A protein has these predicted regions:
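Hydrophobic, well-ordered beta-alpha structural blocks that scaffold small-molecule cofactor pockets
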Residues: 1-43, 50, 163-221
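Short, conserved SAM-binding/catalytic segment
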Residues: 47-57
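An accessory alpha-helical subdomain
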Residues: 129-180, 188-191, 267, 277-387
Length: 387
């Protein structure tokens, strides 16, 4: 399970290395969160080219070079070379000490993972399956968009950007959270030390969540106000004397002043849905709480976590047996929509009916009847591996 958080990226220097749609998505998400976005790539997509032409993104028209990651707050590696991506991770995280590094599709070379997000008029909602099923994540995102359609502004990947006088300006300025949409992520905290400074109910909640995420939690005394160099994340309810905006710190007394904050959450095993208001006000947080309660009824203790565990258990076999990302993606789509008779139909995931009893993969898994589908899955893996 990844630790859910929203980053405060206003004016932070962020670097994306790579081309293609993945790099485009990374760059646009960071831009919409207020970042000072830099891109290194010998080629760019049409949409990125438009942003560069309007001075929204700083572009370096070349391949990655040693030393490129120096001075950045966050680095995303999205090249088509595994070796290059590994070089980027080692330089950024291990040599330069950058805490926020993401290598696309390589969890061991990530300190965080980006999550899907739905931006509503009053709140933003992040969805993470902790990397176990992008297909499930997408369907939940689409369901949430549909459920709150009268309030939906647009999904990050579809929304157009706003230009003003050819300068970097807030995108969708009506969504003011430091003038930007917050950047949703999941911290990979397993076996990483996280320091807690102070004692209150919020911090106790953070401790419990961190432990669920596999973090090593260190409790500090109230008067320990200086940075712990061994800490990946720091949570404090007191004034943090050495905080300069570069460390990963949540200040629970004033979340908007830290580098990140923990949203309201709905959790079922590795399914984590985060809800945060787009305005920092009492009424906005109350509305976010209402959304949290609604989504908890829909998603907590309904079998989604077990379903993700099942799909995640298939990934090692699928990764070694099915040769291309496109085929692997389609395999999981087919499995999700499979019923017990081997027929393909669109699975509702109980979104519209909590009492749904269709003999689909989802219902068979959550009622512990996986033996009925394992043979079908094995045959499908063989089919995809040969085609």
């Amino acid at each position: 399970m990844f630790y859910p958080a929203f980053l405060n990226l206003q004016d932070k220097k962020c670097l994306v290395i790579g081309a293609g749609t993945v790099a485009e998505r990374k760059a646009i998400s960071l831009l919409r969160s207020g970042s000072d976005v830099h891109l290194i790539s010998p080629r760019v997509t049409e949409r990125l080219h438009d942003l560069i032409q309007h001075n929204q993104i700083s572009w370096f028209d070349r391949q990655f070079q040693d030393g490129d990651t120096s001075g950045f707050f966050l680095v995303c590696a999205a090249t088509d070379s595994t070796q290059t991506n590994t070089r980027i991770f080692k330089e950024a995280h291990k040599k330069n000490g950058i805490d926020l590094v993401n290598v696309v599709d390589v969890v061991p070379e990530c300190t965080f993972a980006a999550t899907s997000i739905v931006v509503l008029e009053k709140v933003s909602i992040s969805i993470s399956t902790s990397g176990k099923s992008p297909a499930v994540c997408r369907r939940i995102r689409e369901y949430i968009e549909s459920k709150f359609c009268q309030d939906t502004i647009n999904h990050l990947e579809k929304e157009s950007l706003v230009y003003k006088d050819d300068k970097k300006t807030p995108v969708r300025e009506e969504h003011t959270f430091k003038s930007k949409v917050p950047y949703p992520i999941g911290f990979l905290t397993a076996d990483r030390q996280c320091t807690i400074i102070g004692k209150n109910n919020k911090l106790l909640e953070r401790v419990n969540l961190l432990r669920k995420c596999g973090a090593k939690v260190k409790m500090a005394d109230d008067d320990t106000l200086r940075r712990d160099p061994s800490a990946f994340l720091t949570f404090a309810d007191v004034e943090y004397q050495e905080y300069n905006g570069s460390q990963l710190v949540e200040l629970t007394r004033n979340p908007m002043q830290g580098t990140f904050y923990t949203p309201l959450i709905t959790v079922d095993h590795d399914l984590v849905i985060g809800i945060t208001p787009n305005l920092d006000s009492k009424s906005a947080w109350q509305y976010a709480k209402q959304i949290q309660t609604d989504l908890a009824t829909q998603f907590e203790s309904q079998g989604y976590g077990h379903f993700l565990d099942f799909l995640g258990s298939l990934r090692p076999k699928v990764m070694t047996s099915i040769p291309t990302p496109a085929k692997r993606k389609q395999f999981f789509e087919d499995i999700i929509d499979q019923n017990s008779k081997g027929e393909k139909e669109l699975c509702c995931f109980d979104f519209g009916d909590l009492g749904c009893s269709n003999e689909c993969t989802f219902n068979l898994v959550r009622t512990h009847r996986t033996d009925q589908i394992k043979k079908t899955i094995q045959k499908k893996i063989q089919t995809y591996s040969y085609n």
